[in-house]
Design a protein with these regions (language model features):
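Short, aromatic/His-centered strand-loop micro-motif at the edge of beta-sheets
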Residues: 96-119
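Carbohydrate-binding surfaces in secreted/extracellular proteins
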Residues: 113-147
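Generic recognition of long tandem-repeat/solenoid scaffolds
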Residues: 62-64, 135-137, 224-226
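Residues that flank catalytic or metal-binding motifs in active/ligand-binding sites
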Residues: 21, 60, 117, 133, ...
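Activation corresponds to long, low-complexity, non-globular regions
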Residues: 1-36, 163, 167-169, 173-226
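Short beta-strand segments enriched in hydrophobic/aromatic residues
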Residues: 27-31, 68, 125-127, 141, ...
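An exposed acidic His-Trp-rich patch
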Residues: 133-183
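Secretory/extracellular carbohydrate-interaction modules
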Residues: 1-93, 108
Length: 226
């Protein structure tokens, strides 16, 4: 399955020193790269991710997901005390669960994002002081910041760690079509309130690429866009 769908590729950003609370990123999908079954993930963190998606049927969505600390591929198996809880959700946002690649809480907004337009996302990660961490995702569109959702993850005490982005095809039938995405203008805000620009990143791919099963992947820097 993973060989047939192609290698997912990632940018792991070099975070500034200190407790990072917010991560800001921008994405541009050009018209020729707006393909079905593609996830243009913008704001990843050690416990989840957020980005825009074009589904297998061509729907456009904004997704924000947080993994449970309980290891399983079936969300039904997660004990109640280890479930990711939703604290808030934005207008027209759907809340659900996901599985198969870990499990946890998920939110999505049906939003007709347009190829050729730059979109912005902001994710906040902050410990609540009671043994859980709160994750909040925002998406900027139509001239305003839209709340996607705010989740609480139990048994977690962390700030924003593991900032990254990825490009993924999730349907093997579409893996023959080349696709790319541009990420730019990455910033993090520390818990102290200071904003720091991210100027470094490391390119990587999943096991499909690292094992040599597929060679049709690449990453590059183009005038501050990656």
């Amino acid at each position: 399955y993973f060989y047939r769908r192609g290698s997912s590729v990632h940018w792991f950003y070099t975070q500034p020193t200190g407790n990072a609370e917010y991560f800001y990123n921008e994405v541009l999908v050009t018209p020729e790269n707006a393909l079905n079954s593609t996830y243009y993930m913008m704001n990843g963190f050690s416990e989840g991710y957020m980005g825009i998606q074009q589904t297998t049927s061509g729907e456009h969505k904004v997704l924000f997901s947080v993994w449970s600390p309980y290891t399983t591929d079936d969300p039904e198996d997660i004990p109640e005390e280890k479930r990711v809880k939703v604290l808030r959700k934005g207008a027209n946002v759907t809340i659900g669960e996901f599985g198969n690649e870990g499990s946890g809480g998920q939110s999505w907004l049906h939003y007709n994002w347009t190829a050729g337009t730059v979109y912005k996302a902001l994710v906040r990660v902050k410990p609540d002081g009671n043994g859980s961490t709160v994750y909040t995702g925002y998406f900027y569109a139509d001239g305003e910041w839209k709340l996607i959702a705010s989740f609480s993850r139990p048994e977690t005490n962390t700030w924003y760690k593991g900032a990254y982005s990825f490009l993924e095809n999730f349907d093997p039938i579409n893996s023959i079509y080349p696709r790319s995405v541009l990420y730019k203008n990455q910033w993090m805000r520390l818990a102290s309130g200071e904003w720091k620009e991210i100027t470094g990143a490391k390119f990587s791919c999943d096991d499909t690429g690292r094992s040599g099963l597929r060679y049709d992947y690449s990453g590059s820097v183009d005038q501050a866009k990656i």
